[in-house]
């Protein structure tokens, strides 16, 4: 359960992004979501999975508030789902919020930090997310942040939306970023 200090950190938007460490990878592999979001549960802990998560080519980053791991983001091909059309130039973003923090209105602040980091770190003028259509909670968050659906496709009987947003179309908050 997040502490009062952690809640105040969210209010102050003082989130820190840094390349994912082995310890952070092992911690997030223990995250378990309640149905219907259990579909997002990470794979079981293994040396191979940890090695993939900390491999710089996948650009996984921890997101921390008061040194507590609250979320993660990936930048690049990991944010793509087989079957989508990703030919237009954009930075693909994958993300996850700690299960204990979901559904509490904190996603917008985390997403804002991710978008600011992406704008500072990657040359693309466009951010792109791929989201399962059943995840209406995430879709509402992305739409409120200015993302627009540009494509729908199905992979392994799951419908997805690809959503895009021009970077630079938001107000900036305080953010400490530690690029890879």
Predicted regions and their residues:
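Terminal substrate-recognition subdomain of acyl/acetyltransferases
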Residues: 2-10, 154, 158-180
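A short beta-loop-alpha structural element at the N-terminal edge
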Residues: 14-28
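Acetyl-CoA-dependent GNAT
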Residues: 22, 31-100, 117-121, 153, ...
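Conserved acetyl-CoA-binding loop-helix of GNAT-fold acetyltransferases
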Residues: 103-117, 140-144
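Conserved GNAT acetyl-CoA-binding A-motif
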Residues: 120-130
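Conserved beta-strand-loop-alpha-helix junction that forms the acyl-donor binding cleft
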Residues: 128-139, 155-159
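Conserved acetyl-CoA-binding loop of GNAT-fold acetyltransferases
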Residues: 143-152
């Amino acid at each position: 359960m997040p502490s009062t200090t952690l809640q105040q950190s969210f209010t102050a938007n003082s989130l820190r992004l840094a390349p994912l460490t082995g310890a952070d990878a092992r911690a997030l592999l223990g995250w378990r979501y309640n149905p219907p979001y259990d579909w997002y549960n990470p794979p079981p802990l293994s040396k191979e999975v940890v090695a993939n998560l900390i491999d710089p080519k996948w650009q996984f980053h921890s997101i921390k508030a008061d040194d507590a791991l609250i979320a993660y983001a990936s930048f690049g091909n990991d944010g793509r789902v087989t079957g989508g059309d990703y030919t237009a130039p954009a930075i693909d973003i994958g993300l996850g919020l700690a299960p204990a923090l979901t559904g509490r209105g904190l996603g917008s602040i985390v997403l804002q930090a991710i978008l600011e980091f992406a704008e500072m770190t990657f040359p693309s003028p466009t951010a792109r997310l791929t989201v399962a259509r059943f995840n209406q909670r995430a879709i509402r968050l992305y739409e409120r942040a200015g993302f627009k659906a540009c494509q729908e496709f199905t992979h392994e009987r799951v419908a997805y939306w690809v959503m895009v947003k021009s970077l630079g179309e938001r107000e900036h908050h305080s953010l400490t970023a530690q690029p890879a």
